[in-house]
């Protein structure tokens, strides 16, 4: 089910030089929500509620880009693609774990995670129909055992793998 309001997403770790925010244009008239997975299609942000295999995951949507006030839920694109921008936080974040065949376990650490929807990552590409979300790091229960609010969640380094010289951080 598509989001209808902003959500709270928790970062894992401390932001540093490798997790600088990026700014991307929003697709014309599209609405994306703070705290959701930031995906682009044809170069512009779209809601990850119905991801496509060619989408690119960047991080978590944080706020409007320069020139726009953050006063209402959601970020709405302008009359043309990219005329309104969003700031995206990069790095590792706690996301909802997929279910069934899409559920991660600790044994899957280091595996590729795929975008299921705005707040959920899973273990399968669903027949190559889902975009890469990033790298599954571990279960929240192992990384933050004293955080009951994160129960059942996973940590994903969001972004596209780039071999040994870069990629998700």
Where are these regions (language model features)?
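Surface-exposed, low-hydrophobicity beta-strand/loop segments enriched in small/polar/acidic residues
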Residues: 1-169
